[in-house]
Amino acid sequence: MTCKIIGCGGYLPPKVVSNDELAKFVDTNDEWIRTRTGISQRHIAGDTEYTSHIALKAAEKAIADADISVNEIDLIITCTTTPDNSFPSVATKLQSYLGLNNVPSFDLQAVCAGFVYGVQVANSLISSGKYKTILLIGAEKMTSLLDWEDRATCVLFGDGAGSVILQRSDDNSGIIDSNIFSSGADYEILYTNGGVSMNGSSGKIIMQGQKLFRLAVEKMHQSIEELLRNNNFTVNDIDYFIPHQANVRIINKLAELLNVEDHKVVKTVEKHANCSAASIPLALSTIKASGKIKKGDIILFSAIGAGLTWGSALLRW
């Protein structure tokens, strides 16, 4: 038994900050940002717009797209690094907003790899027969973790949410396989310099960009090659490759190593920057809304995040 995605939705806050606008208060410019990242703009949530609020907007769109009753949902997983509060979880607040009494809900924290981790967890839970319909969300207010004087990091991130509804598959569609990995020894490559038990603050993002670029390409490449090999697939079988939308240079280098044709690679980072765990479901929602995905298409997800955490998922639409 496996599960399949029956609906998806994305949400980006209305406030948009272009590279030119960013250059008014950060020592940078549009050409510098575009050349190094491929990003042209990012969306920024308002001061009173929290992760749970943007998660709700994406969840409502996914529920509508799946054409199900909200009461069919029997589990909620929210993948986030930027919860409203240290506790309770974003997922439990979302459960309340949706009016789902007693439905188990929890947050999953694997940073930018969170959605891929969530896919594996959701698939395992549905495959066990314990749950039938899972709401899986990636939602982030990454701008709350930015040092706006650090041009190496503040240009990279944005706020947003993406969501999917997963149900048991009774045919050959759905999650074919997935893999997830971690390497805690590499945590200093990307982290925040704060935390509740460390200093009582959320901290700001610290990143070793060159090391992260190299490891991102290396780890995702290895994960994908292993996943394809274990399931007797080749790159030529892939109809759409949806990688984590962190940086277009990472995406292009990974696609080059895999020898994936450019028209199969989904790139949305230009319009919303790195939304961490929300980036893959946002990209999926964008391409689904375009009408390009057909039943039977083979889709590949891959992501890497702080931790380090990384992994990939293969599915048949």
Swiss-Prot record:
EC main group:
transferase
Mind listing the UniProt keywords for this protein, alphabetically?
Acyltransferase, Cytoplasm, Fatty acid biosynthesis, Fatty acid metabolism, Lipid biosynthesis, Lipid metabolism, Multifunctional enzyme, Transferase
Segments of this protein annotated with the region ACP-binding: 245-249
**Its EC number(s):** 2.3.1.180
UniProt pathway: Lipid metabolism; fatty acid biosynthesis
* One MF annotation (Gene Ontology) recorded for this entry: beta-ketoacyl-acyl-carrier-protein synthase III activity
Q: Which reaction does it catalyse?
A: malonyl-[ACP] + acetyl-CoA + H(+) = 3-oxobutanoyl-[ACP] + CO2 + CoA
Protein localization? Cytoplasm
UniProt keyword Cytoplasm present: yes
Superkingdom is Bacteria
Q: Which residues form the active site?
A: 112, 244, 274
What biological-process terms (Gene Ontology) are attached? fatty acid biosynthetic process
GO cellular component, alphabetical, reads: cytoplasm
Q: How does it assemble?
A: Homodimer.
Q: What does this protein do?
A: Catalyzes the condensation reaction of fatty acid synthesis by the addition to an acyl acceptor of two carbons from malonyl-ACP. Catalyzes the first condensation reaction which initiates fatty acid synthesis and may therefore play a role in governing the total rate of fatty acid production. Possesses both acetoacetyl-ACP synthase and acetyl transacylase activities. Its substrate specificity determines the biosynthesis of branched-chain and/or straight-chain of fatty acids.
* Matching PANTHER family: 3-OXOACYL-[ACYL-CARRIER-PROTEIN] SYNTHASE (PTHR43091), BETA-KETOACYL-[ACYL-CARRIER-PROTEIN] SYNTHASE III, CHLOROPLASTIC (PTHR43091:SF1)
Please state which protein family the record places this protein in: Belongs to the thiolase-like superfamily. FabH family.
What does the domain comment read? The last Arg residue of the ACP-binding site is essential for the weak association between ACP/AcpP and FabH.
The protein in question is named Beta-ketoacyl-[acyl-carrier-protein] synthase III
Taxonomic source organism: Rickettsia bellii (strain OSU 85-389)
